[in-house]
């Protein structure tokens, strides 16, 4: 029977993801902190933090795991037509803090958000250190959508997305896929399946298979120019 591990503030190794609980699915450890080195170690081993504002830090590695393969994100014909008509522009790493703030806004029928101030500060530090990245969708000078995540070698670990205009988050996903293909990324970790991710083409895989893919690509070199702030054209 698997048991929950408790972390202290000393830097220590995470338990194996195979030891995560089945109920709640994927809960592996509790406690610790959100220092950059601990966060990067977590993602390197297929673990991520997810907790509410009043909770201790909770670390997860669910089974199954939601993933995308770059090139297999579903950009439907109707979505392509819709996006071609929009006057939107797209950037990478131009407004990371604002994207996180957008993602942190409570959704409809939600009282709060898991993207707490503590989480935002931690990931902003990762961004400053070159590990966390954002995609932005703009209508004029207004930020209308975007997403952010962590790059580990040739793996992009998606964290959250948001939209303020219809389909803007899907546009951000299309931009991300295009960019990752150009930069030879091999895997997008989407963490937990939900209907929105499924509609975009996410697939559930066994945790062991995900860890195998992560291990295969997490140490692969990446183009040094991959995450230089830039404006991009979405090719539809």
UniProtKB/Swiss-Prot annotation:
Keywords: Acyltransferase, Cytoplasm, Transferase
InterPro entries, A to Z: Acyl_CoA_acyltransferase, Leu/Phe-tRNA_Trfase, Leu/Phe-tRNA_Trfase_C, Leu/Phe-tRNA_Trfase_N
Catalytic activity: N-terminal L-lysyl-[protein] + L-leucyl-tRNA(Leu) = N-terminal L-leucyl-L-lysyl-[protein] + tRNA(Leu) + H(+); N-terminal L-arginyl-[protein] + L-leucyl-tRNA(Leu) = N-terminal L-leucyl-L-arginyl-[protein] + tRNA(Leu) + H(+); L-phenylalanyl-tRNA(Phe) + an N-terminal L-alpha-aminoacyl-[protein] = an N-terminal L-phenylalanyl-L-alpha-aminoacyl-[protein] + tRNA(Phe)
Pfam families assigned: Leu_Phe_trans
GO cellular component terms, A-Z: cytoplasm
SUPFAM superfamilies in the record: Acyl-CoA N-acyltransferases (Nat)
Chief location bin: cytoplasm
GO molecular function: leucyl-tRNA--protein transferase activity
Localization annotation: Cytoplasm
EC number: 2.3.2.6
Keyword field contains Transit peptide: no
Function text: Functions in the N-end rule pathway of protein degradation where it conjugates Leu, Phe and, less efficiently, Met from aminoacyl-tRNAs to the N-termini of proteins containing an N-terminal arginine or lysine.
NCBIfam families in the cross-refs: aat
Protein name: Leucyl/phenylalanyl-tRNA--protein transferase
Gene name for this UniProt entry: aat
